[in-house]
Amino acid sequence: MMDALYFDSLTLFHDPALRLLYHRWRGTYNSHLFQPAVQHVQQLLGQLRIEYWIADLNGLPNLGLEDQFLISEQVLPQVARMPHLRQLALVLSSNVYNQLAVESILHLGNEHLRFDVQYFSDAASAFDWLINPTDAPATAAPSMAAGLVA
């Protein structure tokens, strides 16, 4: 059963039995809201020993350069060291700017990642990949650069 967690600018759900965390941005965006939200998610990942993480980027306006730097230089290296994290499902919106920003961030940090990352066009496919593991994620979006599968 999913528990709703609360944070000002995020919709958060946690399933303790699956060790799964889902989050999606809500509301307006600025660095003063984004950075504490990212830090809160990072704290939950460690505190709750999350193994399966869904980051839904729908609703997130264009990421500022300062926030991209924060994620790539501080957050991602710390998250990469979490031994319990197994899979990250990124649900991408149709916002091409954010798709490219995420691709760039993960490309730079890819050498440090110890968990699987897949991109999806919808949350249902992301949940399916996490809770029904297979060798080849058939519902994953093939490439961010090629766009999203509807």
Predicted regions and their residues:
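Amphipathic, Lys/Arg-enriched alpha-helical "gate/interface" segment within cytosolic domains
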Residues: 2-150
